[in-house]
C-alpha cells in the first residue's frame, strides 16, 4: 500500500501534493485574524488518528447491556440490589459474540459496571459484584468470558464502565476517583487488548447524596498508558455521542468540529503528546461543523460520531419486549441513518436471564445480514465507463479498495463525474466514501441521470465523510453523473457505488 501511495503522490503536481499530503494531525489551532480561506485550508487537513480511523472502519459494533438490571427488570438500578439476584442459568458469551460477528459486526462492548455499581468481574475493590452471587459459586467472570470469546472469534473487545456509582460509599469524594482508577486498571490489565473504553455522561447522586467531580484527564492518561490503541468514547477525546438514541445521525455530519477554549488549553498542555480532552458543549445541535460553525473557532478537532440505539425499546432485557425487537428492515434503515451518515453504529443486543441472546434478536440479526448481503453484493458502477475532465484516478472509485481514491487536478474544488453503462441499469441506492485519511472535504453534491438529452436530479446531499448512503425511488438510466458542488480544497472519493435494493 505504501508503494502505491508513493507512486500516486509522485504523479501529482507539486501544488496538489501539498494540498493532499500535508502532515496529518487530528487537531489544529486557529489564530485570531485568520481568514476564512486559511481556516478552510486547515479544516481540510484535520484527519483522524490511527485509532480513530480503525474505529471508523468498523462500521458496526455491538453493545451488551447485562447485569443485575437483567434480573430486577429495571433499566437503572439503585445500587442496593442483593448480589444473589444475579444468577444466569446458561450464560454463553461465545453465543453473543458469534451471533453479532456472523451478522457483520466487528467489535463488542460489555457493560462491566452500570450505574448500580455492580461489577461483572471479581473486582478487589467492592463486594457488589459477581463474587457475591451464586453464579459459578462466586468464581465467575463475565468480562473474561466475553473477552475470551472475542479473542477466539477475532473480533474487537471493549468495556463500558459507568462513572456514576450508586453503590459506592466513596462516590462524591476525591477518594472515589482513586477507586474508579483502581477498577479501570483491573479492566485494562486483566483481559488482553481492549479496543474501546466507553464512558457515559450520567452524574447523579451517590448513597451519600453527593455528586462526583470526575477526574477524566487522569482516566484518559491511564488508558493511553495501558491500552494505547483503545478509543475512548462518548465522555472521551476520540469519539463523541451523536446526540440521540434513535439510531439516526445528522444529514450533515462533520467529523471536524470546533474546539472550545478548554479543549485548546488541554491540547496546548499536551503539546508533543497524545492529545486527550473531555468533551464540552451541546453535541446535539443539528450543525456542528459547517463553515458558519468553524468561522470563529479557536481550533478544530477530529471528533467523529457514534450512533447508539437498542434493538429493543429498553437497554436491558425485559421479557415483555420480546415482541418489540426491531425488524430486519428497521435495522437496515438504521444502518443507512448511522453508518450511512458518517457514523459508526453501536447496536445494543441485551442478553436475557439465561445469559444468552434471545432467539427473537438472533433471528432478526440474521435476516438483517441477509438483507445487507443482497443489497450490496454488486456495485453497478463497476460496469460503467467513468470520466471526469478534471479528475485523477477515476478507476479508484470502483476498485473496492478504501486506500485508493479519486481526486481533482490543480486546486479544483468541484467535479463532474460521468458514468456511461453498456445498457440502462436500475438502481435506488447511492454510496459514497471519502478517503478520510486525507481529511473530510465534500460539502455538497447532486446525483443526476440523463433522459432524452436532459439531466434530471435523482438525489442530493451535503457531507459525505467515511460513508454516505442515500435511498431513493428506483431509476433506470444509461448515463448518470455525480456533481460535487462544493468542497474544502480538492475532494476525494474512495467509493462511488450504485446499488439496487429490495
Sequence positions of predicted segments:
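Mature catalytic domains of secreted/periplasmic carbohydrate-active enzymes
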Residues: 19-413, 418-419, 423-433, 440-441, ...
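Bacterial Sec-dependent N-terminal signal peptides
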Residues: 1-22
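Inter-blade boundary loops/turns of WD-repeat beta-propellers
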Residues: 435, 450-452, 501
